[in-house]
Amino acid sequence: MSFIRKFKRGGRVYLAEVENRRAGGKVVQRFVRYVGKEADGRTILSASLSDAEVEAVKLYGPLLVLHHLATEIQLPEQLGDHSQEILSLVYAHCVDYRSLNYMPSWFERTDLNFLLDLEGLTERRLVGALNSLEALDAEAWQRRLFEGVCRHYRLRPSGVIYDVTNTYLYGRHCPLAKPGHDKDEVKGRPLIQVGLGVTQKEGFPLFHKVFDGNVHDARTLQDLVTLFGTYGLRPGLFIYDRGIVSGRNLKDIKRLHWDTLCGVPLNEGLKKFWRPYADPHQLMQLPNRQRVGPTIFYTCLRPYQLDGVRGRLALCLNERHQREAREARRDEVLYAQSLLAQGKSIKPGLERFFDARGHLLPGPLAQAEEFDGYSCIFCTRRLPEDQMLSLYFDKDIVEKAFRSLKGVTQLRPVRHWLAEHVHAHVFICYLAYLLLSLLQYRLRHTEFTAESALLELGTMYKAYLRDAKHVFKLSRVVALTKKQEIILKAIDRRLLRSKD
């Protein structure tokens, strides 16, 4: 079998096709033909362009970047025997995932076989890879993966943000799918819950877990606090939304020597506590003004014990939100009043604002408007007021993670029916989000997001050329744009060599 060998002559590097032959009991190389030479690290063919044919053009740029990020944190080694198939699914979820049965044809349009060993890829192999994920000890595996990320990126996380989302399933026979509170407010869909913890600064995922669709948000954190305790992180701040807060969660996190910063629902007890301070004219004084990004809050801070845990409670007034909520309700009430005058039915829930004859009741309306625009947050650490607000209200990094999971990585809708395949599908999406978050971190000093960078690299193809006359094959990456060079440099300058 022939191959290409380099020869140095007079300071230049030449390429020749040679083949091994056995002569006199020894293996010797026989010159077949001159191929070309190297100049500035590039191959210059001796053949005429008229003899060259384009054999194939493959998608290369996004996959090169994703595979580089995965290899840096030793993801292929950690995934074991089915790593090649699993990584192909992960990369597809980042770029252009549709379904398992579409994967073999999608693979043919990409240069994944240059990066992964996927010769003869079939849907059956991919299903086998999904099954292998279910055999993993997911909790221990996620911890080891995160430890590897911290080592490579030299991270010492001091803040964690936790949140829960749900997604629906097409199939109705999966035991995980249960009726629950759909965060998209669509009724009648079977749901699963996904809890996700990310680092507060970088947005790197620490852990995730899939729950039945009818599990309360606060209960999901109860299950995951024990897992979080095994990570051995130095004490920091655990941040989560008001739907997750509970006395047990506060105490469990405190036992780990971590502090809590969380939202708290404004129930009747808290309304009674805050009523002496909730007068907008009293609260909206200049010393109480705090800016968080484009939003203005007026705040009041008081010591408080929440389920026996000491901390400080902040009442936050968003005057703009108060005005919008109040005017939206009044529009609905006035429209309902006109419908009642015509003897027509009104929107459920608005009846309490009218008497039996359809006359408006000012008392219930004023009561409903009393705490419009107010929110409440609780913190067990003594933070400056502005920092307390910015840390809580700027926690959209986990919301961006969920948008990435649901949008870019195609978390929803889940088309699998078997519970183990649902777990595996979410796990694939979790790994895809991990790579996207690593990419976003590497691009933090550029104008690009992870999604826009992958889109820009989508025109970075590899062309396979064949010399029809001498049956010589060569691959070349198409010329890079300026933006593509910026992206590759931001990730790793060594990737620029991959274009040669």
What spans do the regions from the language model cover?
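Short acidic, glycine/serine/threonine-rich loops at helix termini
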Residues: 169-176, 206-208, 248-252, 271-276, ...
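Conserved nucleotidyltransferase catalytic core and NTase-mimicking acidic/glycine-rich helix/loop elements
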Residues: 432, 436-467
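Dynamic "connector" segments at or just before major functional cores
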Residues: 1-173, 188, 195-208, 214, ...
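An anionic, glycine-rich sequence signature occurring as long contiguous blocks
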Residues: 192, 207-210, 256-391, 458-500
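Basic, amphipathic alpha-helical segments enriched in Lys/Arg and hydrophobic/aromatic residues
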Residues: 418-439
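Acidic, metal-coordinating catalytic cores used for nucleic-acid/nucleotide bond scission
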Residues: 239-248, 266-269, 420-423
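Short, basic/hydrophobic alpha-helical segments
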Residues: 218-235
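Short amphipathic alpha-helical "interface-anchor" segments enriched in bulky aromatics
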Residues: 388-415
